[in-house]
Regions:
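Hydrophobic, helix-rich cores of sensory/ligand-binding and other regulatory modules
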Residues: 1-93
C-alpha cells in the first residue's frame, strides 16, 4: 500500500512552495518524482532520492553532485517517515 499519494504530494508541494519560495519535489519509494513545483520533472527519476532511500538519511547535493546524479539539482533531500518507515523523499532546491 502506498501511503504517499500523488494528490497528497501535490498539495504538500503547492502549500510548501508558497511559504518558502523554493522549488519542492516529492519522490515516492522508488525515487520517482510524483509532485514538483516544476511540473516537467514529474515522472522522472531523482537519483538523490534514491540515495536517501538507500542510506535512510538526509542527503545534501552540491553542484558537483547534481552534475553526475540523474534528475538532481543542488539542495537538500530528506526522508518522509510514517510509522517508522520511509514512505518517500522531499527535496528542496
Amino acid at each position: 500500500m502506498n501511503i504517499l499519494t500523488e494528490e497528497m504530494a501535490t498539495l504538500i508541494v503547492e502549500e510548501t512552495a508558497k511559504r518558502t519560495q523554493s522549488n519542492i519535489n516529492i519522490m515516492n519509494f522508488n525515487g520517482e518524482i510524483i509532485a514538483s513545483f516544476d511540473k516537467k520533472r514529474v515522472g522522472t527519476i531523482h537519483e538523490g532520492a534514491r540515495k536517501v532511500l538507500e542510506r535512510e538519511e538526509t542527503v545534501i547535493l552540491s553542484k558537483e553532485d547534481s552534475a553526475i546524479l540523474e534528475g538532481t539539482q543542488p539542495g537538500v533531500n530528506l526522508p518522509i517517515i510514517f510509522q517508522d518507515n520511509i514512505v518517500g523523499v522531499i527535496g528542496i532546491t
